[in-house]
């Protein structure tokens, strides 16, 4: 459909996004491979790809990634993952005294974590994305209460911008692999390697979108906290290298004390 609408007429089409690429290694075509496959972009006829542009923001000076390396598997040991993940989340939230946006792929995970946090005596308000409610109202509460924590999913990964001191800790609660749907399942069914050709590129694009919520201007600072152990170097999955190489933040640690020191150095 995209090919018929945009690439087979005399009208010139420009496609632009901060997350068109799902890799940083290889040729320009390699970096756009998933986009090319999904859209039928006419690279062999008259299509032109531009070199991916680096972010203008000083990510490596202003941000660090903390990621867990000791949590249960999110799907194979789901109940244990939620329990241990909540404990680690609270540790992370205490570093920044709130000021955190926590992103979820699954609404059920978000609701479970919210219920668990409500049972703890935490020194900051926990806000949650509400069905049918005005999201702008929730976001305004988050902006005004600078020590609050906001749990969200869906459009919160890419559709919001919160600058300044209200957000200095962006938490990814579980890597955002795509939820199975007919489109994803069809792509996987025709792929040579469904994991590396479909699910990992989808996850990387979503992860980049989520991480992009943290640094919204030249003065924003903070940490990204990934509550998931599947990106550790010795994990049996094959995607940790391609994932790390695709992210704009290169400073990372599994030591929560190092993340805390960095946070207090750059955020005060």
PLM segments and residue spans:
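ASCE RecA-like P-loop NTPase motor cores
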Residues: 1-268
């Amino acid at each position: 459909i995209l090919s018929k609408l945009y690439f087979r007429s005399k009208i010139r089409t420009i496609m632009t996004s901060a997350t068109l690429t799902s890799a940083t290694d290889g040729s320009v075509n390699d970096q756009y491979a998933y986009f090319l496959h999904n859209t039928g972009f006419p690279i062999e006829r008259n299509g032109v790809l531009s070199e991916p542009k680096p972010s203008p923001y000083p990510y490596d000076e202003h941000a660090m990634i903390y990621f867990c390396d000791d949590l249960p598997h999110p799907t194979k040991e789901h109940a244990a993952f939620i329990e241990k993940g909540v404990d680690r989340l609270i540790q992370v939230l205490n570093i920044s005294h709130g000021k955190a946006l926590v992103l979820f792929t699954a609404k059920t995970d978000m609701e479970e974590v919210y219920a668990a946090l409500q049972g703890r005596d935490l020194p900051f308000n926990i806000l949650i994305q509400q069905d049918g409610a005005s999201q702008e109202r929730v976001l305004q509460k988050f902006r005004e209460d600078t020590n609050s924590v906001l749990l969200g999913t869906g459009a919160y990964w890419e559709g919001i911008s919160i600058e300044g001191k209200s957000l200095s800790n962006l938490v990814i609660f579980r890597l955002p692999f795509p939820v199975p749907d007919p489109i994803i399942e069809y792509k996987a069914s025709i792929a040579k390697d469904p994991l590396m050709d479909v699910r990992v590129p989808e996850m990387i694009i979503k992860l980049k979108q989520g991480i992009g919520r943290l640094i919204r201007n030249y003065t924003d600072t903070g940490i990204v906290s990934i509550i998931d152990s599947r990106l550790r170097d010795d994990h049996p999955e094959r995607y940790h290298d391609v994932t790390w190489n695709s992210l704009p933040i290169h400073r990372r640690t599994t030591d929560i004390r190092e993340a805390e020191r960095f946070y207090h150095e750059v955020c005060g």
